[in-house]
A protein has these predicted regions:
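Beta-strand residues in well-ordered beta-sheet regions across diverse protein folds
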Residues: 55, 77-78, 85, 111-113, ...
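Short acidic-glycine-tyrosine-enriched beta hairpin
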Residues: 88-104
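Short, conserved beta-strand element in jelly-roll/cupin
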Residues: 68-84
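Ligand-binding loop in jelly-roll beta-barrel domains
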Residues: 104-127
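Conserved short histidine dyad/triad with adjacent acidic residue
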Residues: 46, 50-69, 103-104
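A short, N-terminal "cap"/entry segment at the start of jelly-roll beta-barrel domains
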Residues: 1-51
Length: 130
């Protein structure tokens, strides 16, 4: 899905953001450690080569262990809370209004501690993002 050129499109927030979402499945049975994320997502922009995506994502509390994060991502938390604990044992917790980045190859626990709504922009080199 590529985006039209020369267009401006607002990105919904709050209840409108959640209403625009449909089911997604980034969390796999292999990575899931606890809970059921019941993920939902809305894609707002995809590059012509499908390697760069901007979207909104929602998840219920859950935890997963990620061996090799697939891309470079910027995230802004709109609602809820998330704790990221790298293999070095350092934990970072983010809540509404906080932003963070994850780099390709990151390893650690990705734990949603309160129902989460986030906006993200991710670049996944190599194969197109699915």
């Amino acid at each position: 899905m590529s985006s039209p050129t020369n267009q401006v499109a607002p990105i919904p927030v709050g209840p409108d953001a959640v209403a625009a979402m449909s089911p997604s499945n980034y969390v796999t049975a292999q990575t899931l450690r606890d809970g059921d994320p019941a993920e939902r997502e809305a894609v707002h922009l995809t590059s012509a080569d499908d390697k760069f995506t901007v979207g909104s994502w929602r998840a219920e509390p859950y935890a997963e262990y990620i061996e090799n994060y697939p891309g470079d991502e910027y995230t802004r938390v709109l609602e809820g809370s998330i704790t990221l604990t790298g293999d070095d044992g350092v934990a970072h917790t983010f809540g509404p209004g906080d932003s963070f980045t994850l780099t390709k190859g990151w390893r650690g626990e990705y734990r949603v501690t309160e129902p989460l709504v986030k906006q993200f922009a991710i670049y996944v080199p190599g194969e197109a993002r699915t």
